[in-house]
């Protein structure tokens, strides 16, 4: 390749709207390549490139990075790379060796990065890490493949993706086959978002209650139900949210598809799919999810978990709702079943109060003060309300059409037959740590 020109004490090349300056440079006429060295600066109308060494082709207008390089645009975006190229004409770039892209709102890095600036598309391959800098809605997304759409403000992660939603000291870790996030305000233009009408929970049973065992069960066969008829089945409601009040344009929503696993210190869950919106702070779990809270396993067709101040506040389970808790180290299980279950959490994330409505059933293994079993309560009614203490049932209230009795622990009592419909103790698939959801243990 014939070298036609060299400068050693400063030079400048102007090509259309691109200006390149450096201390030294070599120009090769046959290939139309210019190699710039020392204090290299490329200036364009939309940004700058600073580096120590740069190859530039005057025909293709492709800049090739061969040393540590900093790229800045006029919108505040910064790219740091050590190897790659940028096509000025096509507005595309390929970057290698764990380049970093960041601005005031996020940072992202990966082994390889492909950027299409004209269409606002980017792909990050190999150990990609996205970090949001939003203090209120902060999250991290980690995967072997992340695709972003700047025009739509969306992110999709695949290939062992992990989402970390920052919730103070108790962050939520989520994995699935595919993770996706976007802006709520954009979603509302095209989709119906499932909403929940608040179902009132009568906590009057809690007033004046001390720690009592199940033998003090309150039987209120003729009392008025605390939840109106039909309110449970119709509690899940799809609402066209175009009529909602103005939505904060920064609010995010998250979706997870297939093999969803969730871990936090206070709660764990598995399911088929998930939707979470920053607008109402509700985790929606679909297709027979299972949720664990301390000693309790809760399952159903659909589960809605409400957060307040970034902590679990209440839980709604719709259709085939079942709560199970193992009695200490025994092979016995306390159970509550109904068409729906509503639960409240205390400040530590443990179930504090629970109601089961619609063909509600309850199995409870009563113990005395020395933890000796005294019998099994088997009851059913229209509505069952349960008080918990330290995550364990302490008092039960039955409302309307009460039926049941206390069975002996031995004799004719078949404990397997006492397991309610859909009973399945699934502690073996419960995520025990944030590492479990990644390794599949």
Which stretches of residues belong to each language-model region?
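Structural signature for solvent-exposed beta-strand/loop edge elements and short helix-capping sites
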Residues: 1-441
